[in-house]
From Swiss-Prot:
Known function: The interaction of the RSA site and the PRE protein may not only serves a function in plasmid maintenance, but may also contributes to the distribution of small antibiotic resistance plasmids among Gram-positive bacteria.
Source organism per UniProt: Staphylococcus aureus
Taxonomic superkingdom: Bacteria
Designated gene of the protein: pre
Annotated protein name in UniProt: Plasmid recombination enzyme type 1
InterPro entries tied to this protein: Mob_Pre
Disulphide connectivity of cysteines: none
Length: 403
């Protein structure tokens, strides 16, 4: 059976938003993705927008209309979340074009219920690749109008629950898709571990009882040995070997009645101790004790392996922290540079007629050349920042006039 697939991811920075826009709306002339069949691109469609849009403008419009937070939005706040809905090729091969569209419309309905219809940006269906899929995007605004990707997306557990809800929703629509086994396997592993812990506690108790019995038997054995050592020396029997010869020892010991009784008790105690020890060795507890020792050694090996893996992960985390610090430094330099370019852009636009038109032509030229595409993206970011400054100043002028 086929599986339902739902993915979401935060989009950081307007340049990444622009890249997603150009990919989704097929604005680039060259693509590294060999799965794209450009002869089929005309079949693509957007379930929200009738024509291509500028993602950044729609994000700004959505925030202007729906944001009601009291604080100013931080420059590094996540304004855009992108996602994907699909299944496998076998699932879509069994559907007609109308049924495929219905599946994606039902999926969009689910997303609108989750994130708010008013916050949805696009729902672009690609039919020009090997497996049909839908790219969707939204502004992570909460029900009370705050901008919070963290609250809207949550953690891994929340994402797992989101996938569960999505699978239930599409199945209610009659698509018969599996959610997958990762969650079930995880729960089984947790249950098995819980049971193992319970069993381990039980066997620890049983093992302690066996140890106590062994110690008791050992003490009795040592006591018997000490008692035998402390017994006073015996007299040896002697006899006359000849009619006229003296008396010689026969090698046999002479015991009094009390000494003989004490010796019998010591021998009986020793026999009981040996019997008890043999009985303990033959019990399941003794066998389980040996098995537990083997399992303990096995678990030690597993723990050591985990420790080695943890050490490697720690080194990797430290490396990533250093890279993050370096990127933050680069980001500060980049922000200062962008601020300078915005100032230069506005000055050139004010003093040189036709500057903006020439800037746009040059930007498009760079975008269509894979070698200079990043330059085009940077120019796009500069224009976006200029537009933000323009809107801010226009709003300030409007507020001043109203006062």
């Amino acid at each position: 059976m086929s599986h339902s697939i739902l993915r979401v991811a935060r989009v950081k920075g307007s340049s990444n938003t622009n890249g997603i826009q150009r990919h989704n709306q097929r604005e680039n002339k060259n693509y590294n993705n060999k799965d794209i069949n450009h002869e089929e691109t005309y079949k693509n469609y957007d379930l929200i927008n009738a024509q291509n849009i500028k993602y950044k403008d729609k994000i700004d419009e959505t925030i202007d209309e729906n944001y009601s937070g009291k604080r100013k939005i931080r420059s590094d706040a996540i304004r855009h979340v992108d996602g994907l809905v699909t299944s496998d090729k076998d699932f879509f091969d069994d559907l007609s074009g109308e049924e495929i569209e219905r599946f994606f419309k039902d999926s969009l309905e689910f997303l609108e219920n989750e994130y708010g219809k008013e916050n949805m940006l696009y729902a672009t269906v690609h039919l020009d690749e090997r497996v049909p899929h839908m790219h969707f995007g939204f502004v992570p605004l909460t029900e009370d109008g705050r901008l919070s990707a963290k609250e809207q997306l949550g953690n891994k557990k929340d994402f797992t629950q989101l996938q569960d809800r999505f699978n239930e929703y599409v199945n209610e629509k009659g698509y018969e898709l599996e959610r997958g086994t990762s969650k079930e396997v995880t729960e089984r592993e947790h249950k098995a571990m819980d049971q193992y812990k319970k069993d381990t506690v039980f066997h620890k108790q049983e093992l302690q009882e066996v140890k106590d019995e062994l110690q008791k038997a050992n003490k009795q054995l040592q006591s018997g040995i000490e008692h035998m050592r402390s017994t006073k020396p015996f007299d040896y029997e002697n006899e006359r070997t000849g009619l006229f010869s003296g008396r010689e020892e026969t090698g046999r010991k002479i015991l009094t009645a009390d000494e003989f009784e004490r010796l019998q008790e010591t021998i009986s105690s020793a026999e009981r101790i040996v019997d008890d020890y043999e009985n303990i060795k033959s019990t399941d507890y003794y066998t389980e004790n040996q098995e537990l020792k083997k399992r303990r050694e096995s678990l030690k090996e597993v723990v050591n392996t985990w420790k080695e893996g943890y050490h490697e992960k720690s080194k990797e985390v430290n490396k990533l922290k250093r890279e993050n610090d370096s990127l933050n430094e680069q980001l500060n330099v980049s922000e200062k540079f962008q601020a300078s370019t915005v100032t230069l852009y506005r000055a050139a636009r004010a003093n040189f007629p036709g500057f903006e038109k020439g800037f746009n032509r040059l930007k498009e030229k760079f975008f269509n050349d894979s070698k200079f595409e990043r330059v085009g993206q940077f120019m796009d970011v500069v224009q976006d920042n200029v537009q933000k400054v323009d809107r801010k100043r226009e709003k300030q002028r409007t507020d001043d006039l109203e006062m």
